[in-house]
Swiss-Prot record:
Any one Gene Ontology molecular-function term assigned to this protein's record: cytokine binding
Subunit structure: Heterodimer with OSMR. Interacts with JAK1 and STAT3.
PTM comment, free text: N-glycosylated.
Induction: Up-regulated in lesional keratinocytes of patients with atopic dermatitis. Up-regulated by IFNG/IFN-gamma. Up-regulated by bacterial lipopolysaccharides (LPS). Up-regulated by triacylated lipoprotein (Pam3Cys). Up-regulated by TGFB1/TGF-beta.
Repeat among keywords: yes
Species whose genome carries this gene: Homo sapiens (Human)
Chain's role: Associates with OSMR to form the interleukin-31 receptor which activates STAT3 and to a lower extent STAT1 and STAT5. May function in skin immunity. Mediates IL31-induced itch, probably in a manner dependent on cation channels TRPA1 and TRPV1. Positively regulates numbers and cycling status of immature subsets of myeloid progenitor cells in bone marrow in vivo and enhances myeloid progenitor cell survival in vitro.
Membrane side Extracellular: residue ranges: 20-519
Outcome of substituting Y670F: No effect on STAT3 and STAT5 activation. Mild effect on STAT1 activation
Tissue expression remark: Expressed in CD14- and CD56-positive blood cells. Expressed in macrophages. Expressed in keratinocytes. Expressed in a subset of dorsal root ganglia neurons (at protein level). Expressed at low levels in testis, ovary, brain, prostate, placenta, thymus, bone marrow, trachea and skin. Expressed in bronchial and alveolar epithelial cells and pulmonary fibroblasts. Detected in all of the myelomonocytic lineage. Isoform 6: Expressed at higher levels in lesional skin compared to healthy skin of atopic dermatitis patients.
Name of the protein this chain belongs to: Interleukin-31 receptor subunit alpha
Keywords: Amyloidosis, Cell membrane, Cell projection, Disease variant, Glycoprotein, Immunity, Membrane, Receptor, Repeat, Signal, Synapse, Transmembrane, Transmembrane helix
Regions that span the bilayer: 520-540
Entry's Gene Ontology cellular component terms: axon; external side of plasma membrane; membrane; plasma membrane; presynaptic membrane; receptor complex
């Protein structure tokens, strides 16, 4: 029985656990649109299924009830419901309750209570006239029509808002009108003269918290009056050659002056500070005037005027040329905040509370327009970005003003909006070394910067190598690269950067040197120093042993043609031959000429031998005449061995023996003295030539026949005539 009951209850429990009741309506609000409807709204919460909402109302001070029904599938606004006329009357008290129902159940909101007077909302009033009041300055009168759909039994409250035509900021005025007051007008005072205003109006039941919508806007203008005043400023220029100084006067309408204020002209008068009697007056319709004042201080005054009167007098003191102005601004900076350019500064003079700000575009030529504005009781100044040109550099100066004196200005440059530079810097390469180079660049023209240059970045890379970069501040226009590779090509370029980005300049190529100037000078110095030392040593050696140096550089070659052997005759020749033994101790190198393998030397030797042969031939010719009478004749010639070269074998032909290029005269004379007088010239010549065997052994073996000799001079033996006397042969 128990199990049966449990099985029967299980589906019901599951269904109950899976049920999702609708969310409880919250934030109920009701508005009574006068003579139209009562509309209530609420927050439905999250819906998971079809939900129907029912608004239950109790009205007529609790005596009547009705409902307003809506659902999430059919109502355009599923969280709103309205009650319509004629079942809406004022005054009355209502109770409102919202009930939400879906397939899983019903849930109700809290009960809310409403007074219709407190939630009534009327139509907006209609403005039909805005006009100035004759004879009353700076005032306009607004007239409107009371809303038709407004409680007759209730007082209304109003809000009037107004602004100038060129302004976006509204000002508001609140006031109330009695339900019995038929004059629906309001006088708006404290306005600017000759200024056009925009007016709008709204109203509400005095007890209600709901305001009507704003009325349609209407425009009106205040009456014209005399000018409000002027602000005066000056631009001082350098003194001219005659001592007079040009001063440009600038003026504009005083702050707060009407935009439409009419001015017919300006009266200016000025005089030296030390003498008011020297006053000069000028009249102009322009907005500026240039005066040529002396070197002393001056006072300048001016007014503007129109048909209704004159403005208050504006005065300005012009300091003397030699007068020193005070300085109190310590630091100043500019920054961009949202859509404004903000300039801030710090002052060391606490008694200075008025400042004059001056700004103009930084262009190459003198600016045609200069803007200025005064600031009081503050150390900052702001200007809208749209009043300045983007990407243009502006010179901003702040002048401290204390009473009638103007202090030394503090100037900076600023951009209202910065961009990327239009072009990069022009780059050059200087002082190229082995491992170093200097990169120089020029500043970008002002018109191409589009911002304040904050830094420069140098990019450089070797061919096929890794790239490097160096960043320097904007005040540096050159940079030295170090640790480069010797004899390597590089590419380099410089990027100029602003706060908005950077732009690269032109890229250039360069190649490092193989040798530095120092290395070249060092090598040249070493070589030159070595040569200098060698020259010094050579000169010193030459001074110490001049003959030796001369002999080494220019060796003396004997010339047989200049020999004195031709002058040897008779006993002199014999006496010179007797010097043999004393000459034997002389070095062989002093008696002979060493052979040389070069063709030029051989030619010289050949010439010497020929000349010497001619000399001998002449000697034998002279002696033959005197020796014929002693000639034995008839004897057969025999071979005679060279008396001075016993080592030369007999039978050697003349061609096999070498030629000695030099025959000492004393030995030739000795041979001549031992020969018989009757010997034939040919025998004498052969006998005399056999004296050449005095040369060293190696010359005897390696000699070659000389074609210039009549007979071969290489022979080591010669024939003696058989007709020679016996004692002559023996002597030979």
């Amino acid at each position: 029985m128990m199990w049966t009951w449990a099985l029967w209850m299980l589906p019901s429990l599951c269904k109950f656990s899976l049920a999702a009741l609708p969310a409880k309506p919250e934030n109920i609000s009701c508005v009574y649109y006068y003579r139209k409807n009562l509309t209530c709204t609420w927050s439905p919460g999250k819906e998971t299924s079809y939900t129907q909402y029912t608004v239950k109302r109790t009205y007529a001070f609790g005596e009547k009830h009705d409902n307003c029904t809506t659902n999430s599938s059919t109502s355009e606004n599923r969280a709103s419901c309205s009650f319509f006329l004629p079942r809406i009357t004022i005054p009355d008290n209502y109770t409102i309750e919202v009930e939400a129902e879906n397939g899983d159940g019903v849930i109700k909101s809290h009960m809310t209570y409403w007074r219709l007077e407190n939630i009534a909302k009327t139509e907006p009033p209609k403005i039909f006239r805005v006009k100035p009041v004759l004879g009353i300055k700076r005032m306009i009168q607004i007239e409107w029509i009371k809303p038709e759909l407004a409680p007759v039994s209730s007082d209304l409250k109003y809000t009037l808002r107004f602004r100038t035509v060129n302004s976006t900021s509204w000002m508001e005025v609140n006031f109330a009108k009695n339900r019995k007051d038929k004059n629906q007008t309001y006088n708006l005072t404290g306005l600017q003269p000759f200024t056009e205003y925009v007016i709008a109006l709204r109203c509400a039941v005095k007890e209600s918290k709901f305001w009507s919508d704003w009325s349609q806007e209407k425009m009106g203008m205040t009456e014209e009056e005399a000018p409000c005043g002027l602000e005066l400023w000056r631009v001082l220029k350098p003194a001219e050659a005659d001592g007079r100084r040009p001063v440009r006067l600038l003026w504009k309408k005083a702050r707060g002056a009407p935009v439409l204020e009419k001015t017919l002209g300006y009266n200016i008068w000025y005089y030296p500070e030390s003498n008011t009697n020297l006053t000069e007056t000028m009249n102009t319709t322009n907005q500026q005037l240039e005066l040529h004042l002396g070197g002393e201080s001056f006072w300048v005054s001016m007014i503007s005027y129109n048909s209704l009167g004159k403005s208050p007098v504006a005065t300005l003191r012009i300091p003397a040329i030699q007068e020193k102005s005070f300085q109190c601004i310590e630091v100043m900076q500019a920054c961009v905040a949202e859509d404004q350019l903000v300039v801030k500064w710090q002052s060391s003079a606490l008694d200075v509370n008025t400042w004059m700000i001056e700004w103009f575009p930084d262009v190459d030529s003198e600016p045609t327009t200069l803007s200025w504005e005064s600031v009081s009781q503050a150390t900052n100044w702001t200007i809208q970005q749209d009043k300045l040109k983007p990407f243009w550099c502006y010179n901003i100066s702040v002048y401290p003003m204390l009473h009638d004196k103007v202090g030394e200005p503090y100037s900076i440059q600023a951009y209202a909006k910065e961009g990327v530079p239009s072009e990069g810097p022009e780059t050059k390469v200087e002082n190229i070394g082995v491992k170093t180079v200097t990169i120089t660049w020029k500043e970008i023209p002002k018109s191409e910067r589009k911002g304040i240059i904050c830094n420069y970045t140098i990019f450089y890379q070797a061919e096929g190598g890794k790239g490097f970069s160096k960043t320097v501040n904007s005040s540096i226009l050159q940079y030295g690269l170090e640790s480069l590779k010797r004899k390597t090509s590089y590419i380099v370029q410089v990027m100029a950067s602003t706060s908005a980005g950077g732009t690269n300049g032109t890229s250039i190529n360069f190649k490092t040197l193989s040798f530095s100037v120092f290395e070249i000078i060092l090598i040249t110095s070493l070589i030159g120093g070595g040569l200098l030392i060698l020259i010094i040593l050579t000169v010193a050696y030459g001074l110490k042993k001049p003959n030796k140096l001369t002999h080494l550089c220019w060796p003396t070659v004997p010339n047989p043609a200049e020999s004195s052997i031709a002058t040897w005759h008779g006993d002199d020749f014999k006496d010179k031959l007797n010097l043999k033994e004393s000459d034997d101790s002389v070095n062989t190198e002093d008696r002979i000429l060493k052979p040389c393998s070069t063709p030029s030397d051989k030619l010289v030797i050949d010439k010497l031998v020929v000349n010497f042969g001619n000399v001998l031939q002449e000697i034998f010719t002279d002696e033959a005449r005197t020796g014929q009478e002693n000639n034995l004749g008839g004897e057969k010639n025999g071979y005679v061995t060279c008396p001075f070269r016993p080592d030369c074998p007999l039978g050697k032909s003349f061609e096999e023996l070498p030629v000695s290029p030099e025959i000492p005269p004393r030995k030739s004379q000795y041979l001549r003295s031992r020969m018989p007088e009757g010997t034939r010239p040919e025998a004498k010549e052969q006998l005399l030539f056999s004296g050449q065997s005095l040369v060293p052994d190696h010359l005897c073996e390696e000699g070659a026949p000389n074609p210039y000799l009549k007979n071969s001079v290489t022979a080591r033996e010669f024939l003696v005539s058989e007709k020679l006397p016996e004692h002559t042969k023996g002597e030979v």
